[in-house]
Design a protein with these regions (language model features):
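Catalytic metal-binding/acid-base residues of hydrolase active sites
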Residues: 15, 67-69, 121
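Boundary at the C-terminal end of the N-terminal hydrophobic targeting segment
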Residues: 2-6
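N-terminal post-signal-peptidase region of extra-cytosolic proteins
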Residues: 16, 45-48, 97-101, 117
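Polyanionic/metal-chelating signatures
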Residues: 103, 108-225
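Histidine-rich, glycine-flanked metal-binding segment
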Residues: 14, 18-58
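Soluble non-cytosolic domains of exported or imported proteins
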Residues: 24, 81, 85, 94-101, ...
Length: 225
């Protein structure tokens, strides 16, 4: 739609998030990429009119766990911005999000308009997930940044038991940093693990209930842990 022009969609079965649910034989008026009015037999000055003939119209779908915008081709390392060898829990993928990814138009055609893009890792913590609009606009793509910390005790390299112990130890270290009101050292973590101040800050946000910790679990024992 050209900026400033209006689009009128007529006679659709509109599924809303309101208590009334489905509004049958309903019109939708869109201008400048925004829904302006919803109702029956709308009288508006629209430059373009499309008759839906009872087709279903829904709000945009959300991809709640994806690498949209941060991975282009999985097998090509140069096109992957979903992982880091420097950071773990503190990895934020916001600055790497590509609103012009070739995968975005494909997903838009399937009705997906929003993504929760999640970094990945073979270790315990993969990093911080952020929510983006698939508007293809560099300025308007970010919805919410660093809203959840993701990890896994059941996939990737290493023992499940070791990951569970590291989960306990890393949260314990972060809690002691909170109690000390500042960063001191990583005492209590294995020498092979390396946590930056950025990583510890992310764990502190989890402990203070500012953001959730989402951990992948593939076994009943993982969940019971």
């Amino acid at each position: 739609i050209v900026q400033g022009e209006g689009l009128l969609l007529k006679g659709g079965n509109v599924h809303t998030a309101d208590p009334e649910g489905v509004q049958k034989n309903t019109d939708i008026y869109i201008k400048d990429g925004k829904i302006i009015k919803i109702g029956k037999d709308l009288q508006v000055d629209a430059s373009r009119v499309e008759d839906l003939n009872g087709k279903i119209v829904t709000p945009g779908f959300i991809a709640p766990y994806s690498q949209l915008g941060i991975v282009e081709i999985e097998a090509v390392a140069e096109t992957r911005d979903d992982r880091s060898t420097v950071y773990s829990s503190g990895l934020s993928i916001v600055s790497a999000f590509n609103p012009h990814s070739t995968l975005i138009p494909y997903n838009l055609r399937g009705g997906i308009t929003t993504t929760l893009s999640v970094p990945s890792s073979s270790g315990l913590y993969s990093g911080l997930a952020s929510s983006f609009s698939l508007s293809s606009s560099l300025e308007g793509s970010l919805i919410s940044r660093d809203i959840a910390l993701f990890g896994s005790v059941s996939s990737g390299e290493g023992s499940r038991a070791a990951k569970m112990l590291l989960l306990e130890d890393s949260l314990d270290v972060a809690s002691r940093v909170i109690e000390a009101n500042g960063w001191n050292d990583e005492k209590g973590l294995p020498s092979s693990s390396s946590y930056s101040s950025r990583d510890i800050i992310a764990l502190k946000r989890v402990l203070s209930r500012e953001i959730p910790l989402v951990v992948r679990a593939d076994r009943a024992s993982d969940i019971l842990f």
